[in-house]
Amino acid sequence: MAQELSEKELLKMEVEQLKKEVKNPRALISKTGKEIKDYVEAEAGNDPLLKGIPEDKNPFKEKGGCIIS
């Protein structure tokens, strides 16, 4: 799609995008970093990658074995 547009059209789209982005509220990383860290630590108990999935609720556990007769 970008190849079909002229350079002027591409620059116009970029300016429009930058106008949208400049309206986004900005915050200091020292504040947001702490908020993210606190959230991750608070939710760590519910994270299946950290605590694992119970065997009875694991959708990827093999249902049965192979029977050869």
From Swiss-Prot:
Any single GO molecular-function term of the entry would be: G-protein beta-subunit binding
Q: How does it sit in the membrane?
A: Lipid-anchor
Q: Note the pro-peptide positions.
A: 67-69
Where a lipid (S-farnesyl cysteine) is covalently attached, the residues are C66
Q: Which GO terms describe its cellular component?
A: heterotrimeric G-protein complex
Role description? Guanine nucleotide-binding proteins (G proteins) are involved as a modulator or transducer in various transmembrane signaling systems. The beta and gamma chains are required for the GTPase activity, for replacement of GDP by GTP, and for G protein-effector interaction.
The record's listing under PANTHER family reads: GUANINE NUCLEOTIDE-BINDING PROTEIN GAMMA SUBUNIT
On subunit structure and binding partners, the annotation says: G proteins are composed of 3 units, alpha, beta and gamma.
**Name used for this protein in its record:** Guanine nucleotide-binding protein G(I)/G(S)/G(O) subunit gamma-T2
